[in-house]
Amino acid sequence: ALVETFKRLGHEVKIINLHNPRISDTYIYHFWRHENNMYLNLKETISCLILRKGIKRENCFKKFINLFPLTRQYEIGDEIDEDFDCLVCGSDQVWNTKIIGERAISYYFLDFGHPLKRISYAASSGSNRFADGNENFFKGILSKFNKIGVREFFLKKYLHESLDLDACFTPDP
C-alpha cells in the first residue's frame, strides 16, 4: 500500500532487496530441533517432507516480493551503493533486533547512505525494547530521521521516555 501511495504521488520507488539469513532461515526446516519431544519432531518432519510447508511458504513469499520494484540483492555486510533521495522503513517487526539480528541493525534503522530524508512509517519493534543498554547508539541513529512514525503506542512512549525522541502513531498500511 505504501509503495502504491508513493507512486501515485509521483515518486519513483525501489525496495532495497536485503537478504537477511536470520529471516530467510525461518523457512528452512531444522530436523530434530525439539530434543526432548519425539512427537513434535515427527510431526514437523512430516509437515516439511510430505506437505512441503516451509517450501510453499518461501515460494509464496518470493512470488509476492517479486511483484515490487526491487534493487539488486544485498547481503548483510554489503555496502548499499545506490543513491536515494529518501529512505523509508517500517511495518511489522522492522525494529525488533531479536528478529533482525545485531548485524542488520544499520540496514533496518536506515543508518547508511546520504539521503536527503529518512522516514519511518508504522515501524514496529513488537514488544522488544531494542535500545536498552544502548540508548546513545540508537538515539544517534534515530536522530537522523526527519520523521518517525510507529504502529504501536508502546513504541511511541518508549522512544519518548527512553530516547527523548518524538514519534507519531501511524497505522500499518
PLM feature spans:
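A short beta-strand/loop micro-motif in the catalytic core of glycosyltransferases
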Residues: F145-E152
